[in-house]
């Protein structure tokens, strides 16, 4: 089985190493910077390099993971889908709704599987939280609390290309609210500040944001996201219902403690290592002709999470007025 990693930066390298561990297959590395593709190919078993997606398709490819920069996603996904290659694209498919929908409908028209990398769907803790919530173990859900805080922000030049903290980071949380409850978000009230990284204000972005959401059954949610949490990567969720509360995530993982403990998680790659590997395994199974995993992120998940993130942007830049996605 020939599998391509298109985009050989940090997240592409992470996926390549998961693919290595899951083998056997032939890995092809593709990147706009040939040296980066060569370096990753040398680090992984049974890997070669293709100069472009066009060359990759001409040589033959059974599945592809798009892990390039956000602005490159639409063009790469379009080329792969039109060539009939099952594709897993890191979120988001695009940073605007029309292109997201266009890519999704293109995949449906061609009958090509298109997954979006919402790896939290494959995290055992989040999956268990969803199963218990949807099964009614908590009774009527009243409130959700979600936290997503990075250790440190990416370079500003990269952030210029990836959208705001709402569409880049909190996008996961909007997706999780929908996925955990099976409900739709109908109102968003958001706010933000550039506290630790004031330079983000120059590009119309924030490093610390909050969002309050209302679902279509009047359940409420409180979301927070941030670019700066030096004590460790902090992602967790709590669902509060009539019969009790359930939570996922190391709520005490980032407490400094008396001795100033080391961070438990350095970033998404170790916090969600199990989830990423499970997602890749499920994707390869599907691409090889097996069943599609119901946990897989879809283009509609990406579209609807982006719709909420853009509503949060509008709210935060308009004096925190309520916005309907």
Curated annotation (Swiss-Prot):
Q: Which reaction does it catalyse?
A: myo-inositol + NAD(+) = myo-inosose-5 + NADH + H(+)
Q: Can you name one GO molecular function term for this protein?
A: oxidoreductase activity
Has keyword NAD? yes
Q: Which GO terms describe its biological process?
A: antibiotic biosynthetic process
Give TM regions. none
Task: Give the protein's biological function.
Answer: Dehydrogenase involved in the biosynthesis of the aminocyclitol moiety of hygromycin A, a broad-spectrum antibiotic. Catalyzes the NAD(+)-dependent oxidation of myo-inositol to myo-inosose-5 (neo-inosose). Shows reduced activity with scyllo-inositol, minimal activity with L-chiro-inositol and no activity with D-glucose, D-chiro-inositol, epi-inositol, muco-inositol and allo-inositol. Is specific for NAD(+) and cannot use NADP(+).
- What is the protein named? Myo-inositol dehydrogenase Hyg17
Q: Which organism is it from?
A: Streptomyces leeuwenhoekii
Q: In the record, what lineage is assigned to the organism producing the protein? A: Bacteria, Bacillati, Actinomycetota, Actinomycetes, Kitasatosporales
